[in-house]
Amino acid sequence: MFSSLLEAAKSSPFHGPLTPARCDAPAQGMAASAAPVGDSCEFGSTKYFALCGLGGILSCGITHTAVVPLDLVKCRLQVDADKYKNVVNGFRVSVREEGLRGLAKGWAPTFIGYSLQGLCKFGLYEVFKVQYNNMLDEETAYTYRTFVYLAASASAEFFADIALSPLEAAKVRIQTMPGVRQHTARRVAQDGPERGAWARSTRALVPLWGRQIPYTMMKFACFEKTVELLYKHVVPKPRAECSKGEQLVVTFAAGYIAGVFCAIVSHPADTVVSKLNQDKTATVGSIVGKLGFAGVWKGLGPRIIMIGTLTALQWFIYDAVKVWLRMPRPPPAEMPESMRKRLEAEGKL
């Protein structure tokens, strides 16, 4: 894996002129198929999906934990704008009151919660994408591929947020409420669904869906389409001729572009979730009414930086894990030959 990262750091396919490039022809159908020589598993097999889940654990758990200090300041900006004026001021006040160690508050529930979320988000996305594609014929699957990405990612995130919600609530309380300690997350996990701490922590599940499902739909659909467009219009050679490192650079670039859009579409719901987890008596309506239109966008700047970087790194790590484990990595979608011939005969291509 680390050799892949080093190779990517030294590679960049964007040095040439802007010329169209051919994409590799996709495999016919999305069902599990025999593993080509060199691959560690069959595409669409149980092992393939399990390894995708492992990649999700690493990509989400590591990256979200790495940006805990920025996330802490972002949450405090959202819940106490009078005290924390901006990002720089938020860091200064936090360090002055709690020291540098205070910037790591909430790291444990962040790591556990987002690792579980990553397992479901990436693993189930691959499962649902294959299943939904198999429900369609080849031409329909290609024509409506963006809708397949949207449906698969929304389905995966629905389950991922059920795993994340209790630990996300614990994280926000640790970061924004004085006196709340790290063991809050452990207590939530030990209580289980039937106990009060768990029930209170899941009250923000619906707003969390409101934040994360649009975020994830944008994250996956925008990434898939951006990769497709980069190889078609920007990268000066076909994907098959790119080294693994160059392919990972394209992955990182597409991930960052997707991350910017993710942050924008999900930010109002993110603000509401932070407020709900801070104040157990608040409702979605009361929070939106109190904050107003401008208030729900508070903290968007640092969140764009955080989510853009996070999303790029997550896709990079996820793809690097696939390279490291020698997993099948299908190329971007290309028009089926039957569809191409039909459109050419009709003079539409």
From Swiss-Prot:
The keyword Cell cycle does not apply. It is found in: Mitochondrion inner membrane. It comes from the Eukaryota. GO terms for biological process: mitochondrial phosphate ion transmembrane transport. It is a multi-pass membrane protein. Keywords: Membrane, Mitochondrion, Mitochondrion inner membrane, Repeat, Transit peptide, Transmembrane, Transmembrane helix, Transport. The chain crosses the membrane at residues 48-68, 108-128, 147-167, 207-227, 248-268, 304-324. Solcar repeats lie at residues 47-131, 144-229, 246-324. One of its GO terms (cellular component) is mitochondrial inner membrane. PROSITE patterns: SOLCAR. GO terms for molecular function: phosphate transmembrane transporter activity. Belongs to the mitochondrial carrier (TC 2.A.29) family. Transport of phosphate groups from the cytosol to the mitochondrial matrix. This is Phosphate carrier protein, mitochondrial.
